[in-house]
């Protein structure tokens, strides 16, 4: 048993060195290329409208606010200033979303975003995005990369296609620190020892983002009140939870396997599903020793089996917001074929670790 475990860990480490590192290097190269173009477009936006200040900056070879969706798809979060005159209202009526309401006694004119406030006093995510979309469209025509970048039409999101190969979504957002959403109040679960009080305090202090984008739960049926809502996002908090042990290595292997074998019609699975299931695995295995290098194979198998179970039940709850289903709106047939393909992959890895050489 231990010999089989050791063999799997050896093969996974080899896979990580050969496949995952190559994937990372290729993505890093793409990011540099993409960020040059995006920075140029955002510089042009800022000239037209100084309220939209580019927050895309490189820190320790990482771009702050950039999320890799897949090797050809990225999201850049553009942080906006001055959320201060608004209250964060999160009553759970829209899973995964919240609204920003003008604080009592505050005048509209005190806000930097006065023309985007609705008659009922809400700061409209949709109105801000619509204005930003117009500015980006103009900037694309003027910027020095105009020959290689185009706006993607037929969406309310701000999406650019670069060199006909890459898609970048630019999302206006507010950073919320020092508060924690009511819809995530059940975290951490009282009976689960992970991640421990110190880490919990760090994560809650880190806060979350409010993004101006289409809500998961509302796709295709947005009323105007709902489309004024902002989407909750916990990227930094999640990254902090995944520090230590072989967690990030495990995530890297999962992402590489997904890119190579689970990129299926209907796009049932993305890397965020992998990250979410890894967080649940951390709860199931709360001891740090469970995340030693020697346990990499066990953890990976656990996550793949959990993924199959979620695909078969057609439900994958968000880690912090369990009322939000990350499979919402995905075609059942796509989830079914993803379950079969994941099962084939898991069986292959478990019964014949050497197959990783070909995966």
Curated annotation (Swiss-Prot):
The keyword Nucleus applies. Transmembrane segments: none annotated. InterPro entries: Mab-21-like_nuc_Trfase (IPR046903), Mab-21_HhH/H2TH-like (IPR046906), MAB21L/cGLR (IPR024810). This is Protein mab-21-like 2. It is found in: Nucleus; Cytoplasm. Keywords: Cytoplasm, Developmental protein, Nucleus. Belongs to the mab-21 family. The keyword Transcription regulation does not apply. One of its GO terms (biological process) is embryonic body morphogenesis. It comes from the Eukaryota. GO terms for cellular component: cytoplasm; nucleus. Coiled coil: none annotated. Gene3D superfamilies: 1.10.1410.40, 3.30.460.90. It comes from Mus musculus.
